[in-house]
């Protein structure tokens, strides 16, 4: 039996229904790149034009729909400046139709702990469960971004395999349940 082909969000890079990691040293532009991807995916093609040609990271965007970016370190003002630098004339943002949801956590009480260790067991918290339930209600969800991963975890995911497995397993389950691409960014040491 022939397997189903990969459904790409960003061709040959990020797949729908899968979890992915974007890792680089601090200051490399991960947040800006993910916001650029979110903007392109949420806006879709310009009316009257073909989708082909929309690119991020030199790859074609292959899906459109609702994008949720949960930004643990960027304030609303910072997000607005970044969006302005990507789309100064608002040509792209006028096409969003509410499909780009950016949650600037510094403005709403900070990042919730989504993964913790309880009685020696690493796993998701009730905050993760609640967030997952809300995300699963978005019918055309195609991209969820957690930026950066460390802000949401009190588990040692970068030094203990069991902690990493708990986090990646939960992210993969969210992607499988929603059909969206789930991307987490991670700061690597310089």
Task: Give short role names for the model-derived ranges.
Residues 1-9:
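N-terminal pre-Walker A segment at the start of P-loop NTPase domains
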Residues 10, 52, 60-157:
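Conserved inter-motif catalytic segment of the P-loop NTP-binding fold
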Residues 20-23, 68:
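Short hydrophobic/aromatic beta-strand immediately N-terminal to the Walker A/P-loop
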Residues 26:
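The conserved Walker
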Residues 29-30:
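Conserved glycine(s) of the Walker
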Residues 33-37:
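Hydrophobic positions on the alpha1 helix immediately C-terminal to the Walker A/P-loop
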Residues 40-64:
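Post-Walker A helix-loop "phosphate-sensing" segment adjacent to the P-loop in P-loop NTPases
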Residues 130-137, 164-188:
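Substrate-engagement module of ASCE P-loop NTPases
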């Amino acid at each position: 039996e022939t397997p189903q082909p990969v459904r790409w969000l960003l061709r040959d890079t990020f797949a729908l229904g899968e979890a992915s990691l974007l890792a680089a040293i601090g200051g490399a532009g991960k947040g800006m790149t993910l916001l650029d991807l979110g903007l392109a995916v949420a806006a879709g093609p310009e009316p009257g034009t073909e989708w082909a040609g929309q690119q991020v990271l030199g790859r074609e965007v292959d899906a459109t729909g609702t994008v949720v970016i949960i930004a643990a370190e960027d304030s609303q003002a910072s997000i607005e400046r970044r969006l302005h630098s990507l789309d100064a004339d608002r040509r792209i943002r006028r096409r969003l139709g509410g499909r780009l949801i950016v949650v600037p956590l510094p403005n709403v009480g900070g990042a919730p702990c989504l993964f913790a260790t309880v009685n020696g067991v690493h796993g998701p918290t009730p905050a993760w469960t609640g967030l997952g339930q809300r995300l699963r209600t978005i019918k055309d969800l195609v991209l969820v971004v957690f930026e950066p991963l460390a802000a949401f975890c009190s588990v040692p995911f970068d030094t203990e395999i069991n902690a990493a497995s708990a986090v990646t397993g939960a992210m993969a389950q969210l992607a499988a349940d929603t059909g969206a691409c789930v991307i987490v960014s991670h700061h690597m040491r310089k």
